[in-house]
Design a protein with these regions (language model features):
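Active-site-adjacent beta->alpha loops and helix N-cap segments on the catalytic face
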Residues: 1-3, 23-25, 47-61, 79-85, ...
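N-terminal beta1-alpha1-beta2 module of alpha/beta enzyme domains
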Residues: 1-46
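Conserved, mostly hydrophobic/aromatic
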Residues: 15, 41, 90, 158, ...
Length: 273
């Protein structure tokens, strides 16, 4: 992925949630769906504050099938000793890319009584990750957050700490996204715009915290139930094609951890491969 970005290629990455049980076969099967259509996947660390298989164990299996992992290290669950040990272990196993984000609080997960550690913040963690020679380090930002100025201040700190690329939360409102792009113009980092295919009207209703224009809402709502997934793919492809034309966008990150079979469809229909 680092080579692709440096060459100016339009990069495609995707989310990868490790399974909630010990199931190496599932990891390999899902990896094969994504292997030839994305440059890398972000392997999440107990996403949504729920117990999942270790991201480092998952990343090892992904490497074995030829899929490049970007390993998230959670600041919520480990102190700085454990974090540095995990990073060294991951590098020893062949991991070259890492990801840092402020994840869900443990109270919203499946172990609400768990103790949050938060020994480091994301800026400090990025600094540690960048000590690894030839590492690639990413983080995430919400272009539609309010007030955005505070998030941009935090992003500036991460850039100063050495972050190489940012992924955004899913983009549906292209005009507001362009405003965000204008605010970070000139920053020395790569940007992957987030996209998310809408699988159904029910799925759309669970996305209430995202900024989704009314015309997109109506397109899904007015589609027959058996055609909603198809319409969701069509909308996502339209957004991808528009994003590719925006200066400063170096690629896309596909949020489809619960619908991974949609990823190769999106990539093919958007003419990305």
């Amino acid at each position: 992925m680092k080579t692709a970005l440096s060459k100016g290629q339009f990069v495609v990455t995707a989310e990868f949630y490790p399974p909630k049980e010990a199931n190496g076969s599932e990891i390999k099967e899902r990896a094969l769906v994504l292997k030839d259509v994305v440059e890398a996947v972000v392997v999440r660390d107990n996403p949504l504050a729920q117990v999942h298989t270790s991201p480092i164990a998952t990343a090892t299996l992904l490497l074995n099938v030829g899929l490049a992992p970007i390993v998230q290290i959670s600041i919520r669950d480990k102190n700085r000793l454990a974090i540095q040990s995990d990073i060294l272990g991951a590098v020893t196993l062949g991991v070259k890319a890492f990801f840092c984000l402020e994840d869900c609080h443990q109270r919203v997960g499946d172990n609400p009584g768990a103790k949050g550690v938060f020994d480091l913040d994301c800026v400090q963690l990025i600094s540690i990750m960048k000590k690894i020679e030839h590492s690639l380090v990413g983080t995430r930002i919400n272009p539609f957050a309010h007030p955005l100025e505070l998030h941009l201040v935090n992003l500036s700190k991460k850039i100063n700490a050495g972050v190489d690329f940012i992924q955004t939360m899913p983009v549906f409102d292209l005009e507001r996204f362009k405003e965000f792009i204008s605010l970070i113009k000139g920053e020395n980092l790569y940007l992957l715009a987030g996209v998310r295919p809408i699988k159904s009207w029910q799925a759309l209703q669970s996305m209430s915290q995202m900024v989704i224009p009314e015309n997109i809402v109506q397109r899904i709502k007015n589609s027959p139930e058996n055609k909603q997934a198809e319409e969701g793919i069509k909308i996502c492809v339209e957004i991808i094609k528009a994003l590719k034309q925006i200066k400063g966008v170096n690629g896309i990150h596909i949020f489809a951890h619960d619908w991974e079979e949609a990823v190769p469809i999106l990539v093919r229909q958007a003419n990305l491969k």
